[in-house]
Amino acid sequence: MTSLPEPTAINEIDADALRADPARWTQAAQPWVARSLVDDWPLVSAANESDSAFLDYLLGFYSGNQVSAFLGEADIGGRFFYNEALDGFNFLQVQTTLNNLSEQLRTLATDGSPPSLYMGSTNLDHWLPGLSGANPLPIDLTQPLASLWLGNHSLIAPHFDFPSNIACCVAGRRRFLLFTPDQVTNLYV
């Protein structure tokens, strides 16, 4: 087991600097934050208006295909993980429509102790065709894979994403805990 290094601050870069020289940052193999990178997206404008406007905007692109969603009881506190016996999970995976998921999220928003509900990495081209075109990433990338996470409060266990990621938080809040690549052997039991 490799010991963890001391946490360090993430480079915060200006969105204009990223737009001017994207290769410098996307090929740096170092995490960074560009907070205002997608502020001009219509999706962000809808989210700034209200959660309901955000969901309505997404539904305007929805293909109608079933999506996978994950549902955990309120007592998991949003932490999707193994069950206490470690022989299964503390959540259910369900197939549903984005319309139904959106309605559930609207309802749960007023619940003081809601169950946790989220739709994991969902490919935009298949489930929300046209959304990427209407909200283009303002830097040139070769064939980016664009996907959406959507849900209420959730805590996802550390995991390894093979592709490099540019995560754009367009509604609500999102926090990432990043580990150095040499820690991948410590992520899984």
Label for each model-derived stretch:
Residues M1-V189:
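N-terminal accessory scaffold of Fe(II)-dependent oxygenases
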